[in-house]
From Swiss-Prot:
Annotated keywords: Ribonucleoprotein, Ribosomal protein
PANTHER family registered for this protein in UniProt: RIBOSOMAL PROTEIN S9, SMALL RIBOSOMAL SUBUNIT PROTEIN US9M
Ribonucleoprotein as UniProt keyword: yes
Gene name tied to this protein: rpsI
UniProt similarity note: Belongs to the universal ribosomal protein uS9 family.
GO MF, one example: RNA binding
Ribonucleoprotein is among the record's keywords: yes
Classification via SUPFAM superfamilies: Ribosomal protein S5 domain 2-like (SSF54211)
InterPro entries assigned: Ribosomal_Su5_D2-typ_SF (IPR020568), Ribosomal_uS9 (IPR000754), Ribosomal_uS9_bac/plastid (IPR023035), Ribosomal_uS9_CS (IPR020574), Ribsml_uS5_D2-typ_fold_subgr (IPR014721)
GO biological process, one term: translation
Protein name per Swiss-Prot or TrEMBL: Small ribosomal subunit protein uS9
Organism: Petrotoga mobilis (strain DSM 10674 / SJ95)
Length: 135
């Protein structure tokens, strides 16, 4: 049996985690076991998130060269799109290390550290307080 060639990368954003497998192919997308024509279908019609998520493939000119097999969970669609983007970028590095300067220049290898700030007791939200009255 022929050995399956596969390149793997993990991406995280907010509370979303994406495990991305790149397989040589023609651009098919499979997310959580379900086939999609494009990422827009999974991201409920938001083309901006699709463009962002597929940016690593665009900047390295590898669009349509790989089939994407993605397992993503946690967070909302925006966080999942960001996690997929980082996962694809890291998987591309395992495919070809010469992509590193291109991906780094575009900022695609950096994990976005921004998380939701926790709510503090005595406050309405993380920072919102009740109105202060001097008298």
């Amino acid at each position: 049996m022929a050995e399956l060639i596969e390149y793997y990368g993990t991406g995280r954003r907010k509370t979303a985690v994406a495990r991305v497998h790149l397989r040589p192919g023609n651009g098919k997308i499979k997310i959580n076991g379900k086939e999609y024509k494009s990422l827009v279908e999974y991201l409920r019609g938001n083309e901006v998130w699709e463009i962002e998520a597929l940016k690593p493939l665009t900047v390295t000119s590898t669009n349509g060269q790989f089939d994407l097999v993605i397992r993503v969970n946690g967070g909302g669609l925006s966080g999942q799109a960001g996690a997929i983007r980082l996962g694809i970028a890291r998987a591309l590095l395992s495919y070809d290390e010469s992509f590193r300067p291109i991906l780094k220049k575009e900022g695609l290898l950096t994990r976005d550290p921004r998380e939701v700030e926790r709510k503090k007791y005595g406050l309405r939200k993380a920072r919102k307080r009740a109105q202060f009255s001097k008298r």
